[in-house]
Amino acid sequence: MSFFSFGQSAEIDIVLNDAETRKKAEHKTEDGKKDKYFLFYDGETVSGKVNVTLKTPGKRLEHQGFKIEFIGQIELYYDRGNHHEFVSLVKDLARPGEMAQSQTFDFEFTHVEKPYESYTGQNVKLRYFLRATVSRRLNDICKEMDIVVHTLSTYPELNSSIKMEVGIEDCLHIEFEYNKSKYHLKDVIVGKIYFLLVRIKIKHMEIDIIKRETTGTGPNVYHENDTIAKYEIMDGAPVRGESIPIRLFLAGYEMTPTMRDINKKFSVRYYLNLVLIDEEERRYFKQQEITLWREGDVARKSMSHQAAIASQRFEGSEKTLPQAKEDSN
């Protein structure tokens, strides 16, 4: 037994008051695994009990005080020595003294501000946790408990469609259109692709969802691109005037809301990447940023029904672009 552990010690346990009824959410850990954590939202109260159990009954524990903290923290993996705290709340549970028997302490952090979504990425981690500490002269006794925070949004007032023309002069000219520029995490991307000029032999076409994580500032900026999904649009050569519909369901993919300049430390953005491959394996692509957001748990119609309604509205809203193009000549 080491000198520092000689004498009385204690175990700490943190229990939330609503642990039996509060929902849990899966969240990815640094090693890529998934664990379930208690789920909270911005403004919710965090309350519970701290149980301090003496390891050796009958022996007193000298301490410099008990406290519990609620912390929101950003950790950049390339700068692990520095933790950037954007929320830091402290409650003192006991003054310095001696503890003769195991005790339980109540705590409550009322209407806690939780401005950002929990996130574990390639180069950064944003976490919220409770930390209970028994302060001692030589070595403190600590226990941490992580929670997960989701940020909810309302339906955006402005949500215009995305419409662009891309091509190679005298070789390829296409127009693509997506029904919206902002999607919730269980939404359906509905769109169309029109081939106005095809003079190269296209053999494959797909849409990729790309997640781009940006960390750091100034000269210390790191970018990580991750392909979340690949959606095959066609396999074979298109012809002039052909129109190909797109229906891409987002619910099956692991994504977070778009996160822009979080505490001036990192961003997470999403892009639709339109990719064409010709018979000589040359790749042509065009990226377009989209905004993702998380909606609350409200009653929704089935995703297939949503897709059908969105498709009907989208297809019936305008004359087909190839025809409109010909009419303008």
UniProtKB/Swiss-Prot annotation:
It is a peripheral membrane protein. One of its GO terms (biological process) is intracellular protein transport. InterPro entries: Arrestin-like_C, Vps26-related. Its main location: cytoplasm. It is found in: Cytoplasm; Membrane. One of its GO terms (cellular component) is retromer complex. The keyword Protein transport applies. This is Vacuolar protein sorting-associated protein 26B-like. It comes from Danio rerio. The gene is vps26bl.
